Amino acid sequence: MNKIIAANQTLTSEAVSEGHPDKIADQISDAILDEILKEDKNAKVACEVIIAQNLVVIAGEINSPVKKNIDIKEVAKNIIKDIGYTNIDYGLDYKTITVIDAIGNQSRDIINAIEKKGSNALGAGDQGIIFGYACDETKNFLPAPYELANSILKKASNLRKSGAIKWLRPDSKSQVTIEYDKNRNPVKIKNIIVSHQHHPNISQKLIQQTIIEEIIKPTVQDKSMLDENTAYCINPSGNFVIGGPTGDTGLTGRKIIADSYGGFARHGGGAYSGKDATKVDRSAAYMARYIAKNMVAAGISKEFELQLAYAIGIENPISIQITGGINDPKYANKILNFIVNNFDLTPNGIIEKLKLKQPIYLKTCTYGHFGKNEFEWEKLDFVKKIQTALKK
């Protein structure tokens, strides 16, 4: 990676709210996963959702005896209600939706590959390329445009749900462009885009004024990054009344960049939501983030990107590589040796370290999977050990 950034170069990230159709699908997938894990911590789950108009189709594979105990249709309805889709005029109504349950059983071939007979070891649930990333741009070790894009939508969601801004509806997106100096420090916010669903009888002028003054500006912590040249694009398409799945079909796993690092890091292509922790697309991505965050917090580099690669049925990664943040090959090899010798990167090791058999996943899947400090992969408990072994 090692991005070369010239003075006055801009970088951009986007985010989506919990009411975006793809995020509705992610939340239903992860809510079902959580309900299964509450009764069976060893369940194998791959849950996919498509949502269009007033129809929700839940598919995928679940291997667990408790599957029959879960009212999957009720789980989906409760998620939609909690998001705020309580009226068909909003684009979806939990009271009238049709839910189709098309979940099957996990392939016996895959089960046999993951679970080794006569052993407690777990093989990887699939092949995959996984990246973890961190940088020093924010206190959460995330890219500044990405964190701000998410923070704006979280603020809007809070104001909508509290009733402070009654004409906001659930569906929304944001995009933030920030200017960087030659030392790769964010210095100015160049552009902020917010597209937010709204009640039909609200003027565009009021929408623009409210979103800028009551949502965006209070969210920007460093006011010096805003100036007279900052451009605000609020609902640039005009009316945004038709939203939710009436306006756009939603699908689990379609917001993988918004889920991770907002385009600042590579992505192997595997989505997170709806997958139990034997799926390394998810669990190894969390572990790679944990390692990268501790490396940056330890002062090893301003940014750090780690690639892991797995083969189905095999415990250990088949490849580990530092793909960003370290320019010295000898130092990179030293760091790699440290990673191999100090972090258990098998599925079992990751699951145990990050406590991934708990029903935590619904909380992960909105406004990014990273930067939420209640989760194990965000802890900075390896910093001192890294500094002792690796600090130049």
Swiss-Prot record:
Q: What EC number(s) is this enzyme filed under?
A: 2.5.1.6
Q: Which residues bind K(+)?
A: E48
Q: Which cofactor does it need?
A: Mg(2+); K(+)
**Co-factor binding details:** Binds 2 divalent ions per subunit.
Q: What cellular-component terms does GO give this entry?
A: cytoplasm
Mind telling me which PROSITE patterns this protein's record contains?
ADOMET_SYNTHASE_1 (PS00376), ADOMET_SYNTHASE_2 (PS00377)
Give the catalytic activity. L-methionine + ATP + H2O = S-adenosyl-L-methionine + phosphate + diphosphate
Q: Which residues bind ATP?
A: H20, D171, S172, K173, D248, R254, K255, A271, K275
Give me the segments passing through the membrane.
none
Cross-referenced Pfam families, in alphabetical order? S-AdoMet_synt_C, S-AdoMet_synt_M, S-AdoMet_synt_N
Chain positions covered by the region annotation Flexible loop: 106-116
**Where, in this chain's numbering, is Mg(2+) bound?**
D22
InterPro entries (UniProt xref): ADOMET_SYNTHASE_CS, S-AdoMet_synt_C, S-AdoMet_synt_central, S-AdoMet_synt_N, S-AdoMet_synthetase, S-AdoMet_synthetase_sfam
Q: Which residues take part in binding L-methionine?
A: E61, Q106, D248, K279
- Spell out the subcellular localization from the entry: Cytoplasm
Q: Which Gene3D superfamilies does the record match to this protein?
A: 3.30.300.10
Q: Name one GO molecular function term.
A: ATP binding
Biological process per Gene Ontology, one example term: one-carbon metabolic process
Give the metabolic or biological pathway.
Amino-acid biosynthesis; S-adenosyl-L-methionine biosynthesis; S-adenosyl-L-methionine from L-methionine: step 1/1
Where this protein primarily resides, as one coarse class?
Answer: cytoplasm
List the NCBIfam families.
Answer: metK
PANTHER family listed in its UniProt record = S-ADENOSYLMETHIONINE SYNTHETASE
Belongs to which family? Belongs to the AdoMet synthase family.
Q: What does this protein do?
A: Catalyzes the formation of S-adenosylmethionine (AdoMet) from methionine and ATP. The overall synthetic reaction is composed of two sequential steps, AdoMet formation and the subsequent tripolyphosphate hydrolysis which occurs prior to release of AdoMet from the enzyme.
Which proteins does it associate with, and in what oligomeric form? Homotetramer; dimer of dimers.
| Name this protein carries in UniProt | S-adenosylmethionine synthase
Organism of derivation: Borreliella burgdorferi (strain ATCC 35210 / DSM 4680 / CIP 102532 / B31) (Borrelia burgdorferi)
Gene expressing this chain: metK
